[in-house]
Amino acid sequence: MSAKDERAREILRGFKLNWMNLRDAETGKILWQGTEDLSVPGVEHEARVPKKILKCKAVSRELNFSSTEQMEKFRLEQKVYFKGQCLEEWFFEFGFVIPNSTNTWQSLIEAAPESQMMPASVLTGNVIIETKFFDDDLLVSTSRVRLFYV
């Protein structure tokens, strides 16, 4: 195992996604929240989100995470897949993470134009969000969450 692989394993071992919520960015109203650690690799997670989230112009996502390890440049790359085809790609950067810290990170996700939106009945169960967790260029973990619109 290379030093980079070992470093990625150390970071992952000490990393936990404590909770997450999604809000309507205009009203601040929480639309979904969960406490499952959606960062755990190797399993397909599931999330049931209200269909009205698809009507929001923008969604505010709040993540609360803990890390025992220092990270120089913590960031996420997310891809939204519909039936295996990548529809959207998002990039988020948190930056420096203090070792043995718990942090809350808020990000804004802008919706696709309404003309490009598919109905919840078509999307439900067919959308997977793949999240890659990085420390700068070091891939720490890849997780997948299948979305169901309820």
Curated annotation (Swiss-Prot):
Membrane topology, from the record: Peripheral membrane protein
Pfam family membership, one: GMP_PDE_delta
Keywords associated with the record: Cell projection, cGMP, Ciliopathy, Cytoplasm, Cytoplasmic vesicle, Cytoskeleton, Joubert syndrome, Membrane, Sensory transduction, Vision
Tissue: Widely expressed. Detected in various tissues including spleen, prostate gland, testis, ovary, small intestine, colon, retina, and peripheral blood.
Main localization of the protein described in the UniProt heading: cytoplasm
Subcellular location: Cytoplasm, Cytosol; Cytoplasmic vesicle membrane; Cytoplasm, Cytoskeleton, Cilium basal body
Gene Ontology MF term list: GTPase inhibitor activity; small GTPase binding
SUPFAM superfamilies linked to this entry: E set domains
GO cellular component assignments: cilium; cytoplasm; cytoplasmic vesicle; cytoplasmic vesicle membrane; cytoskeleton; cytosol; intracellular membrane-bounded organelle
GO terms, biological process: visual perception
PANTHER family in alphabetical order: RETINAL ROD RHODOPSIN-SENSITIVE CGMP 3',5'-CYCLIC PHOSPHODIESTERASE DELTA-SUBUNIT (PTHR12976), RETINAL ROD RHODOPSIN-SENSITIVE CGMP 3',5'-CYCLIC PHOSPHODIESTERASE SUBUNIT DELTA (PTHR12976:SF0)
Disease: Joubert syndrome 22: A disorder presenting with cerebellar ataxia, oculomotor apraxia, hypotonia, neonatal breathing abnormalities and psychomotor delay. Neuroradiologically, it is characterized by cerebellar vermian hypoplasia/aplasia, thickened and reoriented superior cerebellar peduncles, and an abnormally large interpeduncular fossa, giving the appearance of a molar tooth on transaxial slices (molar tooth sign). Additional variable features include retinal dystrophy, renal disease, liver fibrosis, and polydactyly.
Similarity section: Belongs to the PDE6D/unc-119 family.
Function: Promotes the release of prenylated target proteins from cellular membranes. Modulates the activity of prenylated or palmitoylated Ras family members by regulating their subcellular location. Required for normal ciliary targeting of farnesylated target proteins, such as INPP5E. Required for RAB28 localization to the cone cell outer segments in the retina. Modulates the subcellular location of target proteins by acting as a GTP specific dissociation inhibitor (GDI). Increases the affinity of ARL3 for GTP by several orders of magnitude.
Protein name: Retinal rod rhodopsin-sensitive cGMP 3',5'-cyclic phosphodiesterase subunit delta
Protein species of origin: Homo sapiens
